Amino acid sequence: DVCTDTPRDFLEYGGARELALSASCPEAGRLIYRNKEKMKVVEKEISEPFPWKETEDEQVLADEILFARNQAITILQNRSICVEERVCACLEYAKKVQDCLNQDSIVDIHKIPTEPYFYDTTDVEKESESEEKQYGLFLERMRLFSSLESIRTEWDELLLRFQKRYMDSEEGRQQYIADRKAYDDMLNNVNREYEKEQLIVYYCFLCLARCVDDYDFLGKMKL
């Protein structure tokens, strides 16, 4: 009841109200990872009136963004290819959606062909992440995490362990690359790749619809 009444993620748009747990919540983590089946969003109609009336343009935007989010999630759940390829395909699709938003062609979002992203990835531009790029992205994330205000000592201790193990030395860089490879191999070898998929899909659900406010669909996909 507490999570329903005071959810960490709350969004109203297009005549709908979306409630969700923060992905950092232990209960959310249990729900995200407990099943191998593809994640689904549960919708139900309630009698409560919507607090305001959307304009026609706002409703069109909401409908198109919801459609695009659903398409992105479907691409990410295409288990015929590996998660990394699905992410690349989804980013390519997001670029097309962003082009429509930038060109004020919102009504054309649902016209974007999606077949290449579902069935054939040969035409999708892919950039293989080198070990150096992976490590560079890790350093960027660490700089961001270190700039956030901490509310728990456990977070400070975790960052410190990461810094000691992976940063400020060539040995740390090599250790990160080795640990990253071991982690990826572990997930793939024990059939746990679905865990990556579930988390990415959950964040897409949380973030993508929020572009109804700032029109930054691609930016939120990159998150």
Residue ranges: model-predicted function:
Residues 2-91:
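Internal, well-ordered alpha/beta segment that forms a basic, Gly-enriched binding/recognition surface
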Residues 80-223:
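Hydrophobic, aromatic-lined core segments that form the binding pocket/scaffold
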